[in-house]
Structure formats: C-alpha cells, structure tokens
Regions:
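Bacterial N-terminal signal peptides
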Residues: 6-18
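Flexible, surface-exposed loop/gating regions in the mature catalytic domains
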Residues: 25-276
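Positively charged n-region of N-terminal signal peptides that target proteins for export
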Residues: 1-5
Length: 276
C-alpha cells in the first residue's frame, strides 16, 4: 500500500510539473510596447567612465545594465542585422547587403504574422520607405529592416514621424543619425540627444507598460563589449553579469510575444532574470 501511494503521489507531482511553464517563460513579461534605440561604436567602459554621459548613467541607475554584453562582429551592419534577424551578412557595411537572404524571417515579419505591429524610425531618413544607401546624416547600414524585401516600405519612417506614445507599435526601432548616435560625435552629443528624446518617453512608459532597450552596435575594445540597458516598469534594476549579445536581445523579444526564433536567436536563451 505504501508503495502504491508513493506511485500515485509521483504521478500527481509529475503531472503538476508538466503543467508548469518553463522558468524562462514564467519570468518574461509581455510589454505593451518595446522601443529599441541603437547607438554607435562605444565599449562598455567608455560609456561607464564618461562623465558627460549623465542621462545614460541615469538610465543605468533606473534600469538593468548588462555588464557582459557584446556585439557579435564588426563593423556596424552585421550587428544591426543580427539584432533584427538573427543573421549577419558577408560584405561588411555594403549596400545592398549580400550574403543574407532578403526574405529571411525577421522581427518585423514575425510580429506581423502574430498580428502584432512593428515600425522603425530613423533620424535624417529623407522620406518614408526610402531605400537609398546614404543621404546627409542618414546611413542605410544602420537601418537593417531596409535590407529585407518582406518588410513593407511603409514601416520605415523618418524619426520626425515618431508617433504619439499612445500610438506606439508593439515593437519599434529608433535610430539616431550618424552624429546623434555617437558615430561621428562624442558620447556627450549622443547623451544630450537621448535625454531630449527619451526622457519623456521613459516617464510615460513607467505608467504604460513600455520597455526601453538602449544598446550599441559594437564596441571598440578587443572583446567587443557594449552597454545594453533595459528600462521600464517590468525591469528589476541592477547589474547583470550574464553574457549576452544581439541574438540574446532578439530572442528575449521573440519569447516575450511567443514568436518563432529567427536565425541564431534560436541558439541562445532569453534574458530571464532581470524582471520584477
């Protein structure tokens, strides 16, 4: 009888365990909005040590800083592609990108297939849907969605068309121009831009379930370290030492919304320990 009871208890416990979601699934929030902002060409130490990065340091204090975050390669374009599609290309910063299928699954196509929304806002983009390589302070190498024919051109918008916060898509990219993203200017210049454009959004987002992801494309040190910061009401502030990269961030967003995994995001785990 004792053995039978143990057997029944084991079956009950096994059934209960099978009904539970995985640790990662249970831990991930599903924000109303995610806004991803990508800066340029700074290592983690440069960002942390620069006294002029005052607003960035404020975001770090209020959010989750990943102290072991890395770009996946060099130079810019393959890192942007990795964050957007889980894939890289073979022609550096070439325009158009080669060595990558322009119909590969990506964050925009996955969201849209799940009846969720996506849009991208690039500062200095001449007009909605423009596909040229460069114009003034705009560079297509910093706009990965333009390299995919399965992303409607209407989703590629100038930053001047950034919507009212209540009209934000599920996931959006914000790309400053090549001065404001620190590519051709100092951290201080980028920090001023971020404060002017993000501070009101972050304040609104605290009450409206919005996650800000601030990251850099690549670092300038031998380990390709970058700063990556998550800020929002669902974030548990602190410093996190797990190793992450652009694939990890993509995987985290995919898992938040129950999406399939694009490219190499299938090879990594989501960020599961930085949430309230």
């Amino acid at each position: 009888m004792f053995a039978f009871r143990c057997f029944v208890l084991a079956l009950v416990l096994a059934g209960s365990a099978a009904a539970l979601p995985s640790t990662a699934d249970a831990a991930l929030p599903r924000p109303a909005h995610v806004v991803i902002v990508v800066e340029e060409n700074r290592s983690l130490a440069q960002v942390l040590d620069d006294p002029h990065a005052e607003y960035i340091h404020e975001l770090i204090r209020d959010g989750a800083l990943f102290t072991n975050a890395h770009g996946v390669t060099h130079p810019s374009l393959p890192n942007y592609l990795a964050l957007f599609s889980g894939l890289t290309n073979d022609n550096q910063d070439g325009c158009p990108a080669t060595g990558i299928s322009n119909t590969a699954p990506n964050l925009a196509t996955l969201l849209r297939a799940a009846h969720l929304s996506f849009a991208a806002y690039a500062e200095a983009l001449p007009e909605e849907g423009w596909t040229g390589c460069a114009a003034g302070r705009y560079g297509r190498k910093h706009a990965p969605w333009v390299h995919f024919s399965n992303v409607p051109r209407t989703l590629s918008k100038p930053f001047s068309a950034f919507p009212k916060y209540t009209d934000l898509p599920t996931v959006s990219f914000v790309i400053p121009d090549i001065v404001d993203d620190m590519h051709d200017a100092s951290i201080e210049v980028g920090d001023v831009w971020l404060k002017r454009n993000l501070k009101p959004l972050v304040a609104w987002g605290r009450a409206n379930d919005t996650l800000l992801i601030l990251t850099w494309d690549e670092g300038l040190d031998p380990d390709n370290t970058i700063a990556t910061v998550f800020v929002g009401p669902m974030v548990k502030p602190g410093r996190y030492a797990e190793r992450i990269n652009h694939y990890t961030v993509l995987r985290t967003i995919e898992d938040m919304y129950g999406l399939p995994h694009a490219g190499h995001s299938a090879d990594v785990a989501p960020i599961a320990n930085a949430w309230r």
